[in-house]
């Protein structure tokens, strides 16, 4: 049950709406969504019952004169809620407020998520905390919740206060324009963007073993293009499902899924102050609640959520600031999963690896270098004499072997260059000696992008 297929063109109305900025806020230009990215924008979707969304223009950042920058996701009935947050010590005000609300409610009775883009509300002191809380309180007021029914997220420039009066004045409009249509979901996904070039939205249907004749729905939106590296980075995500899941099971499901999705991507190796991924489950589709990690429904739901979040998080990498490559690095035959992920992570954030890929240079020595200096792996994990490195082309043709059991291969540089012309590439690192697999079957996977000249331009201009 894969996420809904991504069509080859954006809806005409949506393309007209976003025309005007290629990299929102950082370097405004009069350009539509890049042609190469339009295929990732869905023209339809299957959305969870009982959820309504809206995207409203506030003008949080002065340079944004027309695009939606306030997103609201709400359920007509109380939800179970769970979230994972940034590990950055300077946690933004909305992160602190959302944590407090989840602790107070134990993940029960949450109805909404309110998100602004254009200002991170991070490192803003007591006033920033009050601003974040006032956003939650205002949404509660307009959705008929007594208190602690709304989670808050913000993204944008650090160290600046929100134009809170402007935001609060637009919440009535945000609530009155709530809708369950595909257009509304897409507009809402657009409202959380900053330097993104396209809105990131997925949806799918699924079934559970206990109710094989019942259809459930899940939808998710995310934002992020820079400052992306676990745990997590300047990355926001909201997932909604109409499956019935109790809060404790939902938190466990989310934590495990994020570890193999949003915490397995990297754009630039920086970890933000704001990242949050939250999930709401309202149970509107009916059926028996998932209330234990031991039942069949939980196991199936875990697989569904992990696969769904992997697809959603990969859209972030595909929109990496200035990126021209989408790279999968797969570490095979590791003695344990954590060691495999550490090696994959080190390769994914290596500037030398990333710039070589941008330059279409099959410089496998940089990959080996990153493998060799990886910290924290289990003793005996990396042994040069049994390490192999290959490129796996996106077109399904045979892998290009670069290093086999510590011995360099005669590399066809022309073929290597041709492989690196493609947008997609997989790097395979075998720690067990190629086909021998001496260490066993643990595998780690990371997704990352290259570094280009545009990345420097975008981030040099970010506050202008």
Curated annotation (Swiss-Prot):
Pathway(s) of this molecule: Amino-acid biosynthesis; L-arginine biosynthesis; L-ornithine and N-acetyl-L-glutamate from L-glutamate and N(2)-acetyl-L-ornithine (cyclic): step 1/1; Amino-acid biosynthesis; L-arginine biosynthesis; N(2)-acetyl-L-ornithine from L-glutamate: step 1/4
Marked site: Cleavage: 233-234
Residue ranges crossing the lipid bilayer per the database entry: none
Record note on modification: The alpha and beta chains are autoproteolytically processed from a single precursor protein within the mitochondrion.
Active site feature: 234
Localization annotation: Mitochondrion matrix
The entry's keywords: Acyltransferase, Amino-acid biosynthesis, Arginine biosynthesis, Autocatalytic cleavage, Mitochondrion, Multifunctional enzyme, Transferase
Catalysed reaction equations from the record: N(2)-acetyl-L-ornithine + L-glutamate = N-acetyl-L-glutamate + L-ornithine; L-glutamate + acetyl-CoA = N-acetyl-L-glutamate + CoA + H(+)
Quaternary structure, from the entry: Heterodimer of an alpha and a beta chain.
HAMAP family named among the record's database cross-references: ArgJ
Similarity field: Belongs to the ArgJ family.
Name the record gives this protein: Arginine biosynthesis bifunctional protein ArgJ, mitochondrial
Lineage of producing organism: Eukaryota, Fungi, Dikarya, Ascomycota, Pezizomycotina
């Amino acid at each position: 049950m894969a996420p809904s297929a991504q069509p080859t063109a954006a809806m005409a109305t949506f393309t007209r709406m976003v025309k005007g900025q290629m990299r929102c806020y950082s370097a405004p230009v009069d350009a539509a969504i890049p042609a190469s990215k339009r295929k990732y924008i869905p023209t339809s979707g299957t959305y969870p019952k009982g959820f309504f969304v809206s995207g409203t223009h506030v003008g949080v950042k002065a340079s944004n004169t027309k695009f939606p920058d306030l997103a609201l996701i709400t359920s007509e009935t109380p939800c179970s809620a769970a979230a994972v947050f940034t590990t950055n010590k300077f946690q933004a005000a909305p992160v602190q407020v959302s944590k407090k609300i989840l602790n107070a409610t134990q993940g029960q009775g949450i109805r909404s998520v309110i998100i602004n883009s254009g200002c991170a509300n991070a490192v803003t002191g007591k006033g920033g905390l009050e601003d974040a809380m006032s956003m939650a309180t205002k949404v509660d007021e307009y959705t008929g919740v007594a208190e602690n029914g709304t989670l808050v997220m913000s993204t944008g420039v650090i160290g600046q206060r929100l134009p809170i009066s402007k935001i609060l004045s637009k919440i009535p409009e945000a609530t009155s324009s709530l809708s369950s249509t595909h257009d509304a979901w897409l507009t809402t996904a657009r409202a959380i963007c900053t330097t993104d070039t396209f809105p990131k939205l997925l949806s799918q249907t699924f079934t559970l073993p206990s109710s094989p004749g019942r259809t459930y729905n899940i939808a998710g939106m995310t934002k992020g293009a820079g400052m992306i590296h676990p745990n997590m980075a300047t990355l926001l995500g909201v997932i909604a499902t109409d499956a019935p899941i109790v809060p404790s099971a939902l938190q466990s499901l989310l934590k495990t899924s994020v570890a193999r999705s949003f915490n397995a991507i990297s754009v630039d190796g920086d970890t933000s102050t704001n990242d949050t991924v939250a999930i709401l489950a309202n149970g509107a589709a009916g059926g028996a609640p998932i209330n234990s990690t031991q039942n069949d429904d939980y196991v199936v739901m875990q697989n569904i959520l992990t696969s769904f979040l992997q697809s959603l998080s990969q859209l972030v990498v595909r929109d990496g600031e200035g990126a021209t490559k989408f790279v999968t690095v797969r570490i095979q035959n590791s003695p344990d999963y954590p060691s495999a992920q550490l090696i994959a992570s080190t390769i994914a954030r290596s500037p030398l690896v990333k710039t070589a890929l941008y330059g279409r240079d099959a410089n496998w020595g940089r990959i080996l270098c990153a493998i060799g200096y990886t910290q924290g792996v289990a003793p005996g994990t990396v042994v040069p004499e049994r390490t192999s490195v290959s490129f796996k082309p996106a077109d399904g043709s045979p892998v290009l072997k670069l290093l086999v059991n510590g011995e360099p291969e005669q590399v066809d540089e022309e073929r290597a260059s041709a492989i690196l012309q493609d947008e997609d590439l997989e790097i395979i690192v075998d720690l067990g000696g190629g086909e021998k697999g001496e260490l066993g079957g643990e595998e780690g996977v990371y997704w990352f992008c290259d570094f280009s000249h545009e990345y420097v331009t975008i981030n040099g201009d970010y506050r202008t």
